[in-house]
Amino acid sequence: MTEKIVLPPQSGKPSDVERIKTESNYLRGTLERTMNDPLSSGIPEDDNRLMKFHGSYLQDDRDLRNERQRQKLEPAYQFMVRVRTPGGAATPAQWLVMDEMARKYGNGSLKLTTRQAFQVHGILKWNVKKYMQEINEVLLDSLAACGDVNRNVMCNVNPNQSALHEEVYNWSAKLSEHLLPRTRAYHELWLDGEKVIDSQDDEIEPIYGAQYLPRKFKIAIAIPPSNDVDVFSQDIGLIAIVEDEKLIGFNVAVGGGMGMTHGDHATYPQLAREIGFITPDKLLETAEKIITIQRDYGNRSVRKNARFKYTIDARGLEWFNEELTRRLGWSIQEARPYTFERTGDEFGWIKGAEGKWHYTLFIQNGRIKDFQDYKLLTGLREIAKVHTGDFRLTPNQNLMISNVTPQKKKKIAAIIEQYKLTDGAHYSALRRNSIACVSLPTCGLAMAEAERYLPSLITKIETIIDETGLNDTEIVIRMSGCPNGCSRAAMAEIGFIGKGPGKYNLYLGASFTGNRLNKIYRENIGEEEILAELRPILVHYAKERLVGEHFGDFVIRAGYVTAVYDGREFHV
């Protein structure tokens, strides 16, 4: 029998979130009552904290907030539900249900996230349970899509190595399943499972314990030469090592993470550091033991310092390696060589193994809906009706129609043509390499616009791009509405992080291959200043770049910023 987990003594008073988790009866709280309370479209904050473990955030429409306050109404509460899709894989049947959920219960759109998951926004409280039950019918769920647990496990999307990719994808699915919370609360609350009145004495979380992790935890697997998952931004980054076209194991990197707090230099983005190599049969055990180290030693007092990166930085990588070896009972091997070439996606039709085809669509900022002159949601619905392969959500918020048989390719190509679905070929390379988080109006943390603003800002930057002949030059550009890092803006060659309405910090100098952070270049500037700052740098780059030199490398060589390979130097 598995014994209950007892945490070692903690320093500092536990945060209020730790109290909520401890008292929650394994994530139940009072959710059953408050989600059925007809007097409010929202729920109390304690239950909102627990809803995250069930894959949902309570939000409100911030565009309406002031007017509703004036009318003495409660905020326009709504729920965002994030669906867990390991490796970004979804069947056509699952796609059709997500499409229906967006139109039936949401705001009519799907958001593809930078962690290869679906998000549906605008769900009213009374519809959340129906939503959960209907996605369950096609074997989808939102358990652990948010919260202080391991989140959606990411996996490289690489059609050029289809057989290998499938093997690696299967490992991402196994990791996701192995690290799921074991509480029955999700099934009780949303799927009408048998109720457990008080499970404190008989329910066990064999990996997490009753308090779960100090903060969220993220894992991704990359297959070189593609680093589309931004493997060094993860708590655990796994790099598939291939010899003679066969997977022999994974290099393991630990302690990455993007979030920080403006003005607090004790918080910073950080790159995961490689600690060695493991064979595939050791993967689940190694990941579990790493998570238990964070469970036991992570900061449960100050949440902004609770991520795994701070645990490692506070105690040292040598301490971590010794502790991991102690828990495993064996030492991992030396890291193996590999090379990354890019973090972006390859668009259009690509022929993979076994004669099957893959088509990658450019989805600007991951937003799928029927625009006035671009029926993207409808077009993809029609493809899902005839497609016999699968869909792959990419870490760059794009979409791959994957494993298309030669027999279906003509039909799907015709639908792509009919609805003018785009691979982005007519867009600038800058736009094709852009990412933005949702931000306003639904994100409660947003300080500035992101998804609604970045496309128009890029249009203005493209004027400079056109003038300098850089239209086909790939430059990674990302925008976050706050410093929490959902768009991984700290790993962009040009990064924007919101400071306030219409104001951003401008960061430069991350690497095109995803192994270096950027650094602040200008603080708290608006659009006019952004364009004025970028113009001379882009002109300089166009004139004096070396052959094959990426923008992020150039701005370091030219002295605009210094290189950052350790997050503790991010603010220096």
Swiss-Prot record:
[4Fe-4S] cluster binds at C437, C443, C482, C486. Binds 1 siroheme per subunit. Binds 1 [4Fe-4S] cluster per subunit. Its EC number is 1.8.1.2. Its cofactor is siroheme; [4Fe-4S] cluster. Pathway: Sulfur metabolism; hydrogen sulfide biosynthesis; hydrogen sulfide from sulfite (NADPH route): step 1/1. Pfam families: NIR_SIR, NIR_SIR_ferr. Siroheme binds at C486. One of its GO terms (biological process) is sulfate assimilation. Keywords: 4Fe-4S, Amino-acid biosynthesis, Cysteine biosynthesis, Heme, Iron, Iron-sulfur, Metal-binding, NADP, Oxidoreductase. It catalyses: hydrogen sulfide + 3 NADP(+) + 3 H2O = sulfite + 3 NADPH + 4 H(+). One of its GO terms (cellular component) is sulfite reductase complex (NADPH). GO terms for molecular function: 4 iron, 4 sulfur cluster binding; heme binding; metal ion binding; NADP binding; sulfite reductase (ferredoxin) activity; sulfite reductase (NADPH) activity. It comes from the Bacteria. Belongs to the nitrite and sulfite reductase 4Fe-4S domain family. Alpha(8)-beta(8). The alpha component is a flavoprotein, the beta component is a hemoprotein. PANTHER family: SULFITE REDUCTASE [NADPH] SUBUNIT BETA, SULFITE REDUCTASE [NADPH] SUBUNIT BETA-RELATED. Component of the sulfite reductase complex that catalyzes the 6-electron reduction of sulfite to sulfide. This is one of several activities required for the biosynthesis of L-cysteine from sulfate. This is Sulfite reductase [NADPH] hemoprotein beta-component. It comes from Lysinibacillus sphaericus (strain C3-41).
